[in-house]
Amino acid sequence: MRNGLLQVLTVVCTSLVVGCAVPSAETQGLSTPDGALFLTIDLQVDPERVEEFLAVMLDAAPDTRAREGCRLFDIYVDQDNPGHVVFYEIWDSREQQEAYLGWRQETGFNARIGPYMVPGGGGLTYFNKVDG
């Protein structure tokens, strides 16, 4: 029952995330826009609490996407390890993304999602686009 519910939730979450992301003309291609910041946040979520975590994140996603500088915010779940969740984000600048993270900290959101995390798992990585 739990695995079936998780599979349904994963499909629904994937559909919602893709359906909610309204790309600008610049991000409709398959490439990160020049000058934009691309990052991933790699998380390990308690396998017993993945469904709850995704519900909280999907509820918060519209606020994230509405932040100044956010071009794209998607959530992905590992097909073979549902506790492995990755956020894929594109921002106009690192400063805007860091201001967003500060806002989430100030509002208590990070403390709210902390109990879902597996200690020592995850990380945030900023990437530069290499043209060539």
Please describe what each predicted stretch is.
Residues 9, 21-23, 29-32, 62-71, ...:
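An amphipathic, aromatic/His-enriched active-site/gating alpha helix that lines ligand/cofactor pockets
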Residues 17-19:
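C-terminal motif of bacterial Sec signal peptides marking the signal peptidase cleavage site
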Residues 57, 61:
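Short amphipathic alpha-helical/adjacent loop interface patches that line ligand
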Residues 44-53:
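Short, surface-exposed ligand-recognition loops at beta-strand->loop->(often short) alpha-helix junctions
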Residues 37-44, 74-101:
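Short, well-ordered beta-strand segments in beta-rich or mixed alpha/beta enzyme
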Residues 131-132:
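Short, solvent-exposed mixed-charge patches
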Residues 1-10:
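Bacterial N-terminal signal peptides that target proteins for export
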Residues 76, 125-127:
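Solvent-exposed beta-strand sheet faces enriched in polar/charged residues
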